[in-house]
Each structure stands twice: as structure tokens, then as C-alpha cells.
């Protein structure tokens, strides 16, 4: 291949790369602006958005963990009219004497200003690095449901919560 053809090939490749970079950056910025706009329009109760999505997952914040607790998750999923899946997981940084999770189900209507208690349960394990629990629940439609979890590993404690998902009547 001649030097001239190689130079043209490099220039064309560079132009193609730059044009793809500009298109990708523009698409990403547009998607972020759309998401920010749509989040601003959603109602919120006590830190949880009221959403129409099929599921929501929450996680512990890094600042609230200690030396034993690594992370924790909470999850709620709409299974159909009048039924949800709810639960959570606690993960320790290593094997601990006692690890646990407490799960609280709360519900609210769109016009409410606070969540009301619906159901709860807990699970503890010993000499392991994780605890998980979940349930399928029959629920009343016309409400948003969220899951709040308390995560513990030995003396470290943290919490997580989901957004509220709408369940059809």
C-alpha cells in the first residue's frame, strides 16, 4: 500500500471515529436530559418516587456501612394485578457470627404524604456472609408499594429502600 493511500485511510478512520464520538455524546446527553425531566415530574413520598415500572431495586449507601457489612439490597416487583414479589439481601464483607435482614412493605396512594405499614418479616443467619429473604404477596390494587430493608452484619447496621411501584386494582 502506498504512503498516500495509507494517509487517506488514517484520515478517513479518524474522521469516522470523531463523528461517532460526537453522535454518542449527543445521544447520551439527550437521554440524561429526558430522564432528569421525567424524574422531576414524578411524585415522591419520603425519598421514594411513585413509578409505574414493573420493579424497583434499592441499595445501601456506602457511607452507612462498617467493617462487617458490605452492602444490602431491597427489591419489589409487580407480578400482576393484586400481587407483588418483595424481599432483600444483606451481604457481609466476610463470614460473620450473625447476619440479618428485616423487610418492611409499605403502601401509599398518589395523593398521600406518607407511607403506611402493610407487612413485615425478618431473617437471620449465623456463621455466613449473607442473608436473603423474599415473598410473593397478595395486595390490594390502587396503591403504590415499596420495600424498606434493615441490613445487619454483627454490629454494623444500614438500610435500603425502593421506589414505590403501582399495582393495578
Where do the PLM segments sit?
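Short beta-strand elements
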Residues: 156-169
Amino acid at each position: 500500500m502506498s504512503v498516500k493511500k495509507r494517509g487517506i485511510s488514517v484520515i478517513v478512520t479518524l474522521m469516522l471515529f470523531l463523528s461517532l464520538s460526537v453522535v454518542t455524546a449527543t445521544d447520551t446527553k439527550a437521554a440524561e436530559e429526558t430522564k432528569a425531566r421525567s424524574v422531576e415530574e414524578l411524585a415522591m413520598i419520603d425519598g421514594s418516587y411513585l413509578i409505574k415500572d414493573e420493579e424497583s431495586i434499592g441499595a445501601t449507601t456506602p457511607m452507612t456501612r462498617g467493617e462487617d457489612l458490605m452492602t444490602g439490597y431491597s427489591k419489589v416487583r409487580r407480578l400482576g394485578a393484586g400481587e407483588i414479589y418483595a424481599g432483600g439481601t444483606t451481604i457481609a464483607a466476610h463470614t460473620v457470627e450473625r447476619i440479618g435482614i428485616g423487610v418492611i412493605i409499605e403502601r401509599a396512594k398518589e395523593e398521600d404524604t406518607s407511607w403506611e405499614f402493610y407487612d413485615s418479616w425478618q431473617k437471620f443467619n449465623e456463621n455466613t456472609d449473607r442473608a436473603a429473604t423474599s415473598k410473593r404477596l397478595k395486595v390490594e390494587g390502587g396503591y403504590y408499594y415499596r420495600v424498606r430493608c434493615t441490613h445487619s452484619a454483627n454490629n454494623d447496621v444500614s438500610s435500603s429502600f425502593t421506589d414505590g411501584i403501582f399495582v393495578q386494582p
